[in-house]
Design a protein with these regions (language model features):
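Conserved ATP-driven motor cores of ASCE-family P-loop NTPases powering translocation/secretion/packaging/pilus
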Residues: 424-526
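Low-complexity, polar-biased intrinsically disordered regions enriched in Pro/Ser/Thr/Gly
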Residues: 128-133, 232-241, 263, 486-506
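General secondary-structure edge motif
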Residues: 99, 126, 142-143, 309, ...
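Conserved long hydrophobic alpha-helices within structured protein cores
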Residues: 115-121, 375-383, 476
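P-loop NTPase motor domains
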Residues: 23-29, 137-432, 447, 515-539, ...
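A short glycine-/small-residue-rich loop at the edge of a beta-strand within enzyme catalytic domains
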Residues: 109, 115, 375, 411, ...
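Basic- and hydrophobic-enriched, low-structure N-terminal and domain-boundary segments
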Residues: 1-152, 156-159, 203, 482, ...
Length: 586
């Protein structure tokens, strides 16, 4: 299909040549008015012809004069065209690069005039929370990559200032539990529902049961995938046969528990009991344990049951192989042999699927020295993203009423979140964002391999707080680009006479060299926002935030007592109606 001719685009550049043609008609008129019969005579008296022709300012419309005007305009147009084709392309003062540091006017279109409706990036730069600004060109996702070495202030200069904005629901990874203590009272003061999951001290934690969020067969597969990705089995290194076999068994058992067990038994404790009951006799292939009998009974009722189909595939393994699979499953679920962990996963209090309904603060406290139970944090994030995306699509027409921000401190230490590279690209439209906080970009690459670049690419904002990891410094150096600078050289030659020389030239220089990045001032940071020049700015001064006075940093009396908060029991009111259930005999 041919594109329609753009008349406007064709006419506008040629309008000046119309005036040239009209003016050039005077040349033809002057030649005609000049006295003389031949060329030499007319050339001799040409000035008289010009005087006669320019007695009137109007162009001549004599046919000969019009031909002269058109010819002159065409010649000039041709000359301009030829010169343009052969023109040299100069970029004055940009010969070796155009990199520069950002200025206030560069960030201005991306900032919401209302301070609390922004993501705090640096002391002078912010990013509006709205995903649909008036000017679509300024729309950016709220995913942020924060990189900074130990002690660079990732929590103080980024996580806590953004928590104090109070414009969203927050899910905060909290190494050591300090953020919850310092900010918990602020959240309660502003009407937030506060939830705590503590993998360091289970006695100071709400309960979390992954089984509570299983609503379909695909939810079972997602849970098993997360469990496999973040726990260690006993299979042979480099052989994924054992993982696939374990996946079949986990899927079958969890499917059975979800569809057949009473609600109070749908938890990891029941799963452990199932695995413990799976006795295998290598010398008797016909032996059936209690789990075999349970599935046999289910198959008699529902031959095409999801759990039955998975279990039949598992039972294809010979006795010795099945025993190895069971051992591998037992090793993977060994942490659940701890009574405290079994108890904390008996039922659910986190209500992950409600984070987008009302303002909630969920603090995920984990150890920064021992990763034994960090797989639970990864499991929470995996279920959280999937639950909120599904609820946004199925209930709210694609967008959650309350934005959910995940501030994932020590992102590399919580384990792998399956399909994070896809989630980072799709959660924006559902009013969800993720801030990945790392000590070095190499941590992300070690965990997510080839998908790390995709994850980084889906973060429109990135902040470097300082560090000395070579890979991070090299990538940042390349991303900042080169600027063009002026240099001069002086020379002196001595002989019979002394002569001096001075030469000026232009060179390309890195906007920030690797050694400059390595010794970055502790109070400075580098912000990169997609489509905007990078900013060399001060880190945010947390003491200047309007809500700082409500943190325990400002006043120790504002410290949030987690144990006291969790021990609070409901006090019934006289005018309220409650449902009472009989738990039965224990």
């Amino acid at each position: 299909m041919k594109k329609p001719l753009n008349i406007k685009k064709f006419l506008l550049p040629n309008i000046p040549y119309v005036f040239i043609a009209l003016f050039a008609t005077k040349l033809g008129q002057a030649w005609r008015f000049a006295p003389g019969m031949d060329f030499s005579g007319k050339a001799l008296h040409l000035m008289e012809g010009f005087a006669a022709a320019f007695q009137s300012a109007l162009p001549s419309f004599h046919p000969i004069d019009l031909c002269v005007g058109v010819a002159a305009a065409l010649l000039i147009r041709l000359a301009v065209y030829v010169k343009g084709k052969n023109a040299k392309k100069f970029r004055k003062n940009l010969e070796y690069g155009s990199a520069r540091w950002g200025r206030p006017e560069d960030i201005a279109p991306y900032v919401d005039p209302k301070f609390e409706n922004n993501v705090i990036l640096t002391q002078t730069e912010r990013l509006m929370m709205s995903n649909r600004p008036k000017d679509p060109k300024t729309a950016r996702n709220k995913n942020v990559l924060v990189v900074g070495g130990s002690g660079s202030g990732k929590t103080r200069f980024f996580i806590k200032p953004n928590l104090m904005q109070l414009h969203s629901s927050y899910v905060v990874t909290d190494p050591k539990g300090s953020i919850a203590v310092e900010c918990g009272k602020l959240m309660l003061r502003n009407g937030y529902k506060v939830k705590i999951f503590n993998s360091i001290n289970f006695k100071k934690s709400h309960h979390y049961n992954p089984f509570a969020y299983i609503h379909s067969e695909k939810d079972i597969l997602k849970l098993v995938t997360t469990l496999i990705a973040n726990t260690k089995g006993d299979g042979k290194s480099g052989d994924d046969f054992w993982q696939k076999a374990e996946t079949l068994l986990y899927t079958a058992l969890i499917g059975y528990i979800h569809y057949e067990a009473p609600e109070e038994e749908q938890n990891f404790a029941t799963l452990i009991e199932f695995i413990n009951a799976m006795e295998v006799r290598e010398d008797d292939e016909t032996f059936e344990n209690n789990v075999d009998l349970a599935f046999k009974e289910l198959a008699s009722r529902e031959p095409n049951h999801f759990a039955v189909r998975q279990y039949k595939k598992y039972k294809l393994a010979a006795g010795k192989t099945a025993k190895s699979i069971n051992i591998s499953c037992g090793a993977r679920l060994a942490p659940f042999d701890i009574q405290e962990l079994r108890e904390i996963t008996m039922y659910d209090e986190l209500e992950l699927d409600t984070l987008g309904d009302r303002k909630t603060a969920l603090f995920l406290i984990m150890s920064d020295t021992d990763s034994t139970f960090n797989f639970l944090i990864s499991m929470i994030y995996s279920q959280l993203f999937n639950l909120l995306c599904e609820k946004a699509d199925d209930v709210y027409g694609g967008r959650l009423p309350v934005h959910v921000r995940c501030l994932i401190d020590e992102c590399a230490n919580i384990g792998q979140i399956p399909n994070l590279e896809k989630l980072m690209a799709t959660i924006r439209s559902r009013e969800i964002s993720a801030c990945l906080v790392l000590q070095a970009q190499s941590q992300l690459k070690a965990l997510y391999k080839d998908n790390a670049d995709t994850i980084i690419g889906n973060c429109d904002s990135s902040i470097f707080l300082g560090g000395k990891e070579p890979g991070t410094l090299k990538e940042l150096n390349q991303a900042l680009g080169k600027e063009t600078i002026d240099t001069f050289n002086t020379g002196e030659s001595r002989g019979r006479e002394v002569s001096h020389s001075l030469n000026y030239q232009k060179l390309g220089k890195d906007l920030a060299t690797i050694d400059e990045l390595a010794v970055l001032d502790g109070g400075k940071c580098i912000l990169q926002l997609r489509g905007v020049r990078p900013f060399l700015s001060d880190k945010y001064d947390i003491t200047k935030h309007p809500n700082y006075k409500y943190l325990s940093d400002a006043n120790p009396r504002n410290a949030f007592d987690i144990e006291k908060y969790l021990s609070t029991r409901l006090v019934p009111k006289a005018d309220e109606v409650y449902e009472v259930f009989d738990a039965g005999r224990v």
